[in-house]
Curated annotation (Swiss-Prot):
Signal peptide: none annotated. The gene is TMC1. GO terms for molecular function: zinc ion binding. This is AN1-type zinc finger protein TMC1. A zinc finger (AN1-type) spans 79-128. Residues 53-70 have a biased composition (Low complexity). It comes from Saccharomyces cerevisiae (strain ATCC 204508 / S288c) (Baker's yeast). One of its GO terms (cellular component) is nucleus. One of its GO terms (biological process) is cellular response to arsenic-containing substance. Pfam families: zf-AN1 (PF01428). Zn(2+) 2 binds at residues 101, 104, 118, 120.
Amino acid sequence: MSDINEIEIPSRKDEIRQVTPKDPMHEIEDKSTYHAKIKKSDSGTVLGAIPLNSRSSSNSSVTSTGQSSRRVTKKTTKKKKKNACYFDTCSSAASKFIGDCNFCKGHFCSKHRLMENHACNGLTSCKEQLHQRNADKLEAEQTKAPKIQI
């Protein structure tokens, strides 16, 4: 072979191989999962499924190494400040000592610290507990001796 552009063509079909490597991400654009072989140290090969979302390509980064391909999706969630009031429209700071709600586990400012003011989910169960406690207290205070008739 003296010319660089000449390529030797094998005579049998079994010897024909594809020379150019395929991009695994390009092949699976329309599939919902991609099975990647991940080799662990001396323990064998593990087959794992990695879900892909072809629509979220603008918010994700793709890294591929050797035998495994991974797709990492960044989640953009809105985090509240640690000491801000948990009420939706309030932006004031939560009270440190009196702002904790035991029923919904929220931290509220002095305006929204009461269960009625922040529309607590545990308001009905709290009312039932207080009603039962008052009934038990009244029953314990009642006199048990029969009344004397004159």
